[in-house]
Amino acid sequence: MFQTVTAPTGVWRGRVTGDVTVFHGIQYARADRFAPPQRCEPQLQHLVEVPEPGPIAPQSPSRLEGVMGAPSSLKQSEACLTVTVTTPHLAQPGSLPVLVWLHGGAFLSGSGAWEQYGAEQLVRETGIVVVSVNYRLGVLGYLCAPGISSGNLGLLDQITALEWVRDNIEAFGGDNGRVTLDGQSAGAHSIVAMLGIDRARSLFSRAIIQSAPLGLGFHSVEQARRAAEIFEEELGSDPRRAVVTDILAAQARTAHRLAGRGAMNSAPPFLPVHGMAPLPFVGEWNGKVAANAARRKILIGNTRDEMAAFFGPHPVFSAMRRVPLAGPQLAGAIQRRVQKVVFDNPVQEFADRFASAGASVWRYGIGPLHPDNPFGACHCIDIPLLFGDGDTWRDAPMLRPLSPKEIGESGTRTRRYWGEFVHTGRISDPAWPMHRPKSRYAHLLTDETIGGSA
């Protein structure tokens, strides 16, 4: 069964499954290599039907496949600027709030079209419209090299996708005046960047910031150009004409060089760049973040053991843990310290900054889903609480030994909270108070107590 929607920029046919319709592969922009995205011209004379997920951005396998499991294999293409829209079947135009999802992946991997980000269960339980975004990654999205690319193309893609939502989502049942921008990891990092970008200011009124590695910051122009120089050395040819496989191989070698001895620096080699459009220099950006956060509704938090996803498989720390007695203690202490620097302390700082600027802020935490899993509450364990279903995630190492039924049930509370926030911009649970500056309280979404008192 199918449903056809006519929007200002096109006519699309989606597949109906029960009471939910999914529209795959809707193109929101076009872009030549290293060029800013250009909005697509309206194509109202042609019906577009994409029964399966469209192509994803060129990328190498995610470094977190050993935690999340491998995603379904999807075609890769530079023509990847598409969204997936999931909506209640036959929703009245403009009637429902919208959640726009920005995937993570260290700005190197990921896709809004991955099966793990399927939004059918979330839409069915909450009655919202979900838009999942593909954007350019790695060198093709964030290279900052004079004469080749100004950088921040992936960020521009995301903003252009939000503009597509503003102009078209009403036809799919969404209310463009009630848009919540939600992202995890690099996607959440992007949302924080957008809070300081004027062009993005009016495109969403609510934000959900999940496990943003805010301690990494963004690149300065100097840092970005140094990464570009290393990449160009590794590529050995003009990136404007190189084949994608060569670009990805040189990108991997660049990451290896920047990681240093023992691969101890795991920061992404390519990030949004302060001082290159549309992201202001850091001083101006800080001021804009404070101004743009005022009167917004923001949900922000992270997991208890973010770094376990990175330290668990890391060869240096695997060897350290094998040292009798002191080894596991030392590895654990280093992991906890890095967790505080990259995640815990910056999340606290930004929650305080947002609240001090006049935003309504709620802070959450996530503990382990099963006591016997060695990854604990690692980075990305929040995703199956929202997206996919038990069968989608059944092979994820971070969720063992949970059954598909237990995986599906583990996210019921989180999906209920997220649905309420997207609908109302608030959390009504009296046990979850609004964040006050300097409060250490984070409301736990799993069955364990962390954080301080409210």
UniProtKB/Swiss-Prot annotation:
Keyword set, alphabetical order: Hydrolase, Plasmid
Induction: Up-regulated by PQS.
GO molecular function, one term: hydrolase activity
Active site per the UniProt annotation: S185 (acyl-ester intermediate), E306 (charge relay system), H379 (charge relay system)
Catalytic reaction(s) noted: N-octanoylanthranilate + H2O = anthranilate + octanoate + H(+)
Keyword Transit peptide assigned: no
Family annotation (Pfam families): COesterase (PF00135)
EC number: 3.5.1.-
PROSITE patterns: CARBOXYLESTERASE_B_1 (PS00122)
Enzyme class: hydrolase
Matches recorded under InterPro entries: AB_hydrolase_fold (IPR029058), CarbesteraseB (IPR002018), Carboxylesterase_B_AS (IPR019826)
Protein task: Involved in the degradation of the Pseudomonas aeruginosa quorum sensing signal molecules HHQ (2-heptyl-4-quinolone) and PQS (2-heptyl-3-hydroxy-4-quinolone) to anthranilic acid. Probably catalyzes the hydrolysis of N-octanoylanthranilic acid to anthranilic acid.
Family statement drawn from the similarity comment of this UniProt entry: Belongs to the type-B carboxylesterase/lipase family.
PANTHER family according to UniProt: CARBOXYLIC ESTER HYDROLASE (PTHR43142:SF1)
Protein name stated in the entry: Probable N-octanoylanthranilate hydrolase AqdA2
Protein species of origin: Rhodococcus erythropolis
Gene: aqdA2
